[in-house]
Amino acid sequence: MGARASVLSGGKLDAWEKIRLRPGGKKKYRLKHLVWASRELERFALNPGLLETSDGCKQIIGQLQPAIRTGSEELRSLFNTVATLYCVHERIEVKDTKEALEKMEEEQNKSKNKKAQQAAADAGNNSQVSQNYPIVQNLQGQMVHQAISPRTLNAWVKVIEEKAFSPEVIPMFSALSEGATPQDLNTMLNTVGGHQAAMQMLKETINEEAAEWDRLHPVHAGPIAPGQMREPRGSDIAGTTSTLQEQIAWMTSNPPIPVGEIYKRWIILGLNKIVRMYSPVSILDIRQGPKEPFRDYVDRFYKTLRAEQASQEVKGWMTETLLVQNANPDCKTILKALGPQATLEEMMTACQGVGGPSHKARVLAEAMSQATNSAAAVMMQRGNFKGPRKTIKCFNCGKEGHIAKNCRAPRRKGCWKCGKEGHQLKDCTERQANFLGKIWPSHKGRPGNFLQSRPEPTAPPAESFGFGEEITPSQKQEQKDKELYPSTALKSLFGNDPLLQ
């Protein structure tokens, strides 16, 4: 502890112990705070010996300050302690930690102003003119043009061959053509061998923009004053009716006319149309597959979004809405739980395992568990659920645990239902009756649940007065059946039988 507490001594230690932790608070800094700061610096892999000097404290502050906003409370406390110690080393009188932070911020602002003034002085003393490629100043002070390098042209051709006209071609063209003249831009376009249909579309866009420029910038009537340059027309900006010297003069005049930047904007506008033609997929059609990782889906989404010709506000709305809406059900459930304010990093972290083997196994297990539970519930509701099986019973001896086929007792004679001999169980007349209350088969006639007689359709009978009528055999059978089976007619079940009326 002695080595750690030896950071301050004498008057500095007295000044340290007079500073309050909080404005208006009672607690003040003590030696234990220096010991704690030394241990924290070791934990953050910083040298605790830096606390002994003001320069060392300044180095520690420079390391800790970028992480203050996202750091923990311990990191902020360490930063406040080192800032207060810096004021003690510099013999700046402060009353509390808040005042020490304000003093330190003032010192940092003064240091920044000094550096800015020094940089401005160095720039003023430097007599060399800035070299803005491809237009540079030679030793005689003249503005000359350096032709675009073959390496740049080779990089541009390689991008077109590999990427065709995908969305990343536009920023690549913008980077390679930085500060180029219209002649340089035409050289880059002429090196494109294939894709002549796209080049023709680009020429049409350039011609349209040149005509619009001529309409908005009409030529002034009268002769041009001596020493003045003519104003560029649309064809001059496109490099078809202007020389390289005129282009350099326009770009370096006071005030300058940036013909190269204007022509570059026209080309980028045409490239946007070509990219949209070569990327026919709409952002509305980008949907995550059921087994596609969320990272691959996000890559496809933003690649298609770059090709969309829309404002930044519209693209922001597409990102907030469609990215979640077009995700698969698993990821969509997770993303909706995160809320609308979730960052892309949080989304990708939350959906990192979706679609992998472990996630598939977990989803399959949950689905099988739900299916099993639902099937069991349906069986219980329908009454199909069978409880424990009933104990079998022997028909021969009447004991449980075996059937008559395996029974060791003497075989019982006669019917197993009524016990009488002369017939078997299947022919026993003491079995359960049918729904009309009669045993079937009967010895004669139709089954009990059928009509016992069926009238045959005949012509109407002749009038009879009952003299000498003969009773036919069929009528005798009908009367006999009525006496034997009085309850088998439909009248006994459903009221009056129309066939018997």
From Swiss-Prot:
- Where is region (Interaction with Gp41) located? 7-31
Query: Where are the annotated segments for Interaction with membrane phosphatidylinositol 4,5-bisphosphate and RNA?
Result: 14-33
Annotated region (Interaction with host CALM1) at: 8-43
The protein, known as:
Gag polyprotein
Q: Where is this region: Dimerization/Multimerization of capsid protein p24?
A: 278-364
Indicate the annotated site residue(s) for Cleavage.
Y133, P134, L364, A365, M379, M380, N434, F435, F450, L451
Q: In what ranges is there compositional bias, type Low complexity?
A: 116-128
Q: What else is known?
A: HIV-1 lineages are divided in three main groups, M (for Major), O (for Outlier), and N (for New, or Non-M, Non-O). The vast majority of strains found worldwide belong to the group M. Group O seems to be endemic to and largely confined to Cameroon and neighboring countries in West Central Africa, where these viruses represent a small minority of HIV-1 strains. The group N is represented by a limited number of isolates from Cameroonian persons. The group M is further subdivided in 9 clades or subtypes (A to D, F to H, J and K).
**UniProt domain comment:** Late-budding domains (L domains) are short sequence motifs essential for viral particle budding. They recruit proteins of the host ESCRT machinery (Endosomal Sorting Complex Required for Transport) or ESCRT-associated proteins. p6-gag contains two L domains: a PTAP/PSAP motif, which interacts with the UEV domain of TSG101 and a LYPX(n)L motif which interacts with PDCD6IP/AIP1.
- For this chain the motif PTAP/PSAP motif maps to 457-460
Q: Where is this motif: LYPX(n)L motif?
A: 484-493
Write out the ranges of the annotated region (Interaction with host AP3D1). Answer: 12-19
Where are the stretches annotated PPIA/CYPA-binding loop?
A: 218-226
Instruction: Give me the ranges of the annotated region Interaction with membrane phosphatidylinositol 4,5-bisphosphate.
Output: 73-77
Designated gene of the protein: gag
Chain ranges for the short sequence motif Nuclear localization signal as given in the UniProt record: 26-32
* Zn-finger (CCHC-type) residues: 392-409, 413-430
